[in-house]
Amino acid sequence: MQANKNQDELVKTFKAILKEERFGSQSEIVNALQSEGFNNINQSKVSRMLSKFGAVRTRNAKQEMVYCLPAELGVPTAGSPLKNLVLDVDHNQSMIVVRTSPGAAQLIARLLDSIGKPEGILGTIAGDDTIFICPSNIQEVDKTLETVKSLFNYAD
C-alpha cells in the first residue's frame, strides 16, 4: 500500500513540476523531484513518465524550450480525450487548419501524419497550438476536412 501512495505522490509532484513550465531537460526534472524527496528517481524513470503522460517540449512565455503537459493528461489515442484538445477546424481551397489547446498541436499532428495519404493527408506542420494540414489532393480538400473532423468528433 505504501508503494502506491508513494507512486501517487510522485505522479502528483511530477505533474505539478511540469505545470511550472520551467524545466527544459530531463536532468532538471530529476533534480526537482529529488529536491521534493523522491531520492530514487532517475533519468530513465522521468523519460518513461514524460512518455506516459504525453508531455511535449514547447516554448514558455519566456521563449524557453520546456516540458509541459497537454490540457488532457494521459497518452492519447483517437478514441480518447484527444478530441477535447481540438478547438477549431477550418480550411480554404488548399489547406486545412486545426487549432488546439496550447502544447497539443505536435501530438495531434503526429496522429494525423500516422493516418497519412490513405485518408488524404500529405503532411502536417505543427506549432504549439496550430496545425497546417496539406491535403494529398486539393480537389478533395472537403473530403479530407470531413475525415479530420470525424476523427476528432468535431462539429461546427
UniProtKB/Swiss-Prot annotation:
Annotated GO biological process: L-arginine biosynthetic process; protein complex oligomerization; regulation of arginine biosynthetic process
Lineage: Bacteria, Pseudomonadati, Pseudomonadota, Gammaproteobacteria, Alteromonadales
Biological pathway: Amino-acid biosynthesis; L-arginine biosynthesis [regulation]
Family listed: Belongs to the ArgR family.
Molecular function terms from GO: arginine binding; DNA binding; DNA-binding transcription factor activity
NCBIfam families: argR_whole, PRK05066.1
CC terms in the record's Gene Ontology section: cytoplasm
Subcellular location: Cytoplasm
General function of this protein: Regulates arginine biosynthesis genes.
Coiled coil: none
Entry superkingdom: Bacteria
HAMAP family recorded: Arg_repressor
Pfam family, one: Arg_repressor
InterPro entries per the UniProt record, alphabetical: Arg_repress, Arg_repress_C, Arg_repress_C_sf, Arg_repress_DNA-bd, WH-like_DNA-bd_sf, WH_DNA-bd_sf
Protein name, entry field: Arginine repressor
Taxonomic source organism: Shewanella loihica (strain ATCC BAA-1088 / PV-4)
Keyword list, A-Z: Amino-acid biosynthesis, Arginine biosynthesis, Cytoplasm, DNA-binding, Repressor, Transcription, Transcription regulation
